[in-house]
Amino acid sequence: MIRLKTLLQYNYFYIILVILVLCLAFIRNSFHNESKFNGSETSFIGIVDEIKKSDDYYKITIKSKEKIIGSYYSKEPLNISLGDKITFKGTLSKPKNNTIPNTFNYRKYLYNHHVYYLVKIDSIKVVSKTRSIKYMVKNYIVKRSEKFKHSDYFKAFLIGDKSEMDDYSLFQKNGVSHLFAISGMHLSLLSGIILFVLKKSRFKEILACIFLILFSMITNYSASIYRSLLLFIYIILNKKLDLRISTVNVLLLVVCTLLIFNPLIIYDMGFLYSVSVSLGLILFNKYMKKNYFVNMFLTSFIAFLFSLPITLYYNYEVNLMQIINNVIIVPLVSVIIYPLTILTFVFRFLEPVLNMFIGILKFISNHLIMINIIVPKVNLIFYFIYYVFLFMFLKTNRKMFILLIFIYTMCLKVKPLLDFNTYVYFLDVGQGDSSLIYNNREVMLIDTGGKDNIKVSDNTIKFLKSTGKSKINYLVLTHGDFDHMGDAINVIENFKVDKVIFNCGKFNDLEKELIKVLDKKNIKYYSCIKKLNIDNSKLHFLQTKEYDNENDNSNVIYTKLNRYKFMFMGDAGVDKEKDILDKYNISDIDVLKVGHHGSKTSSDKNFIDEIDPKYSVISVGKNNRYGHPNKKVLNNLDGSIIYRTDQDGSIMFKIKKNKLRIETYSL
């Protein structure tokens, strides 16, 4: 025991231990876990672990042979509860990969949580109701929460369910969303309250541990909860056994323990945030002052510095004002709203007081200033260098640290400006259209795609941010169909746009709704234009005449990028194709964006033969109900190399020194 105590005093022991455990984790993760399903099953039995509802759509997490996530559509209320044993029939499918580069990979995310299949549920039957205390408590919390005006806050704070929280995206933008995910902060508050209440009891630490373990079970053990719970237990053991291990080394022991039991946790964003912020607060604890408000600022500043690389790695953007925002919001949420939510859950007469403070929180959140900095995707070595600079702060001159950080930031911002290539992306937005043209000076987005209840442009925006772009110079809408411009408002609300270009013809309701937003934001817009310059290239809008068919009124764009000819057809049909051939002299197209998703109403053989495209791109949804692309169209394109977003994912054409390189991001 004495030798063990002595060993635990050495810092090098923990460094070696962390390196060994990390190596072991990466080795274990390199061997992909096998699913217990083969993919052909249609009948299942399992326990309902989580239910999320949106209109007629239910997302149900089920513990069967392994955890699977089911989707179920029903206009009637679904009479199932957490913990119920159910039988259900459905079709298994693999989660979708990210087919737009540098965006959220849903398949990888689920794999890291040991979920290998999704199931589209056709029918559900309850076999037996739950007898599990854990699920009975969760069901009670859900049912009682529904009685309150702000039930979403109760569910978020008490069981970690943020799915119904309408304000969550606002909190994310302000950099304070971590306050509404059950995390180490909440466990620290609860443990502090318990230890204070039981301060005269000899068993207060043991009772606190038991309570926190039970609370963690209800919240499904998120990564940050794991970290906080183990840290609390290890610190108590360190104190009781007089091991005299430093707090930093206790944290490293916690990290090693978590990695041993679940090596995939290393890819969990919540885990990385939790550990990095905890490490920063422990290392910089000596700089804390006695003044509460100074401490609040320092805590927020340190948390910001240590979590910055993780924020940029996942989001490519950071709100510099989140340091101040946290100073304002953290006390309001952690000291008032969070404890008051728990008290109101027990004593309902406190609800008016809670509603008042939630109203104050919403008002403040809507008026917080945002200063967003976009940083392109960089090699992980840049983040390693950042942390080296950060640790230098503890040992060296502060002025040198500030200078190094300034130089480092400038390098990141200058990086996109040194890329002199031209890029054309045909983005996979399902059964819709969205194309992107950009270089180091200007950006043009042609169509946004659009899908009911899904903001497909979120991936487009995130991809743009990953390239270091902070604005779209031109948003060109080929025509007013939802699958081409349905997400335009989302783009404008979440990304700076200079000008919007409409097609010829009358505005439909969707376009009128967009124009209201443009007027409100003072964004210039034009329609029925003939020519546009993007950097050194001219884009020609091939106008012919006004058609009764909205598709034929599509903006058809012809441009020459360096020496390569590109043509974007929108949803133009055979009538417009014929008129284009009659009016314009166009041939030997290098890259054709095929009209109307490969529908038989477009891509007439005479038109294709005349323009003779070398490469043809069809933007189409996988297994779409329209049967796109049509076989006749594929036959017409027989002499062209065809790329399809349903098979190839997003397609990139990169022009570098007059050479064309093609990459796909397949499923």
Where are these regions (language model features)?
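Cap/insert and terminal regions of metallo-dependent hydrolase folds
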Residues: 499, 579-650
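Active-site metal-binding motif and surrounding structural segment of the metallo-beta-lactamase
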Residues: 440-444, 452-503, 582-599, 612-617
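Membrane-interface amphipathic/re-entrant loop segments adjacent to transmembrane helices
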Residues: 312-328, 332, 340-384
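Core dinuclear metal-dependent hydrolase active-site scaffold
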Residues: 263-266, 366-474, 519-588, 647-667
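Aromatic-rich juxtamembrane segments at the membrane interface
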Residues: 112-231, 236-237, 474, 539, ...
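Membrane-interface helix/helix-cap signal primarily in integral membrane proteins
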Residues: 3-7, 13-178, 458-465, 471, ...
